[in-house]
Amino acid sequence: MNEVITKPDSTANSGLIAPAREGDYTGILPSRKIKEMLNRNEIKMMINLDHDQVQPASIDLRLGDYAYPVDTSFLPGKGMKVLDKMEQLDDRFTDFGIDLRKGAVLEKGRVYVIPLLESISLRSEVAAFANPKSSTGRLDILTRLIADGATSFDQVGEGYKGELFIEVAPRSFSVVVKTGTRLNQLRFRRTRGVEARSFSAAEWKKLLDEGKIVDSSDHEKNARSIKTGMLPFTVDLEGSGKEGEIIGYRAKKHAKRIDLERRDYDPLNFWEPIRFHKTSSLILDPDEFYILMTKEAIAVPPDYAAEMLPYDTRAGEFRVHYAGFFDPGFGWNAKLNKAGSSRGVLEVRSHEVPFLLEHGQTVGWLRYERMAARPELLYGQDISSNYQGQSLKLAKQFKQL
């Protein structure tokens, strides 16, 4: 059994709360530990690992060879395998499999279940959880991880051993995918071990005051709204305040399909720009999809990971953000040892009724969590990152306007 260490960690070398160290600490596993899991066959792959598949605090998951259309979303439930549940729902489901090996279209409005190329064999103290990749969310593709015996989406319990599946439901655009396409990502959390220090209210406020989590010009509001380890964020509907400036996008109806391998689509064929006007507000229409951005410049320091929390009905009659993972180093200015200029991009869909969204309105929260150890790779510094230093930005499949 590991001895619990209660002696405070030194913070002198980082300016952060108790820098994450090597050892069996609780928290999110970094890239180095994920590679160790690969070497121990705790993560197994049907084809070789892609060179950029391991991210600072997660691993990308890849589509397998066949997609299976289903009439309804489902969870297998305790003791039931995903494939057995699919056969129970339709004993001929394999007859309708779509071959992805040369590429195929997933139609908007349909739901598909796809076996992934990765399977896992977790230790008893390690759990996992999934989120869509950033580009997946910005294309309005709903994805959810399903594991054998699962009673909830995107969650894999400690000690799980088995296959992984993804539910895919394109909402605004039909998309072309193929074997190996990456739509979601998996994080691993060590739940037991030598305890890493948890946040205190004073330490969290210090991070905010020093501009390490959010740009210092925005920290006052966040200090007033403090919840330890939680950062509220608001929507920007003004930009620089110039009349006619693009402050968001609305997905067009009846646009052509999108090949996820391409990077040269004209945004105006798929998106309607939303421009600033003096009212600084936007009415969200039911079942429309919007790309907006946060007012705050936010950051994730190297010893931390963050996740955007799921939709909360108390924030309004809309859902914000599919892709919840923010990696260590997102928005981080290493030279200044503080937050840089990266905004959070919001993927917004209204629900049953029109909803008036106003500039500066709180629309969600980021939850910060300690890494079990500092990653060897940081977002935007050591790896190629599509969205570092971003302001308002569409998915990587589109050219910049």
Describe each region flagged by the PLM.
Residues M1-L401:
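DUTPase catalytic domain/fold
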